[in-house]
Amino acid sequence: KQTGGHGQFGHVFVEFAPNPDEIEMVFEEKVFGGAIPKGYFPAVETGLRECMEKGILAGYKVVNVKATLLDGKYHDVDSSEMAFKLAAHLAYKDAMPKANPVLLEPIVDVQVKVPDEYTGDILGDFNKRRGAIMGMDMKDGYQMINAQIPLAEMQKYAIELRAMTKGRGTYTQRFERYDPLPQALSERIIAQAKEDNEA
């Protein structure tokens, strides 16, 4: 995209691609022949990183994206770092809606240790929390249950586990990955974000 006017000329061609291996945006440049002086590359990267902080769907940070600066144009007099930063903003705003972005939610790996008599209650509870049972192991009258559950579903879990097991259950959790939100939930969050922005 280009920003025009006296003292503000910058033109960039940026390719955006999924990058599931990295949460933070990965920036590369593949500009050949001096179409853009190297001194402007950091401004393009900064502009893109600023945009990634607030996604287009509901304002959440954009993750798992690789941005590659492929080409562009500059002007000896009218180009500046600010012009290339603004051009990066425009490229992002133009490309992101076309990329079919989705909302993601953090998934945690949960390990629960409970007396065997509570296993059915725990499994039923995990099902209500949109959890996936990954494994179970019985040891000394205790069931070790491993599940992966959306973090949003784990609020107040310590209190609820204590109530379900009469204080005899324990658990640990750690971040595992991000997964796409179910469509109905995603639509609700996007609608709420639009409503909040209009207020």
Segment roles from a protein language model:
Residues K1-A199:
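Accessory interaction regions appended to the cores of large information-processing enzymes
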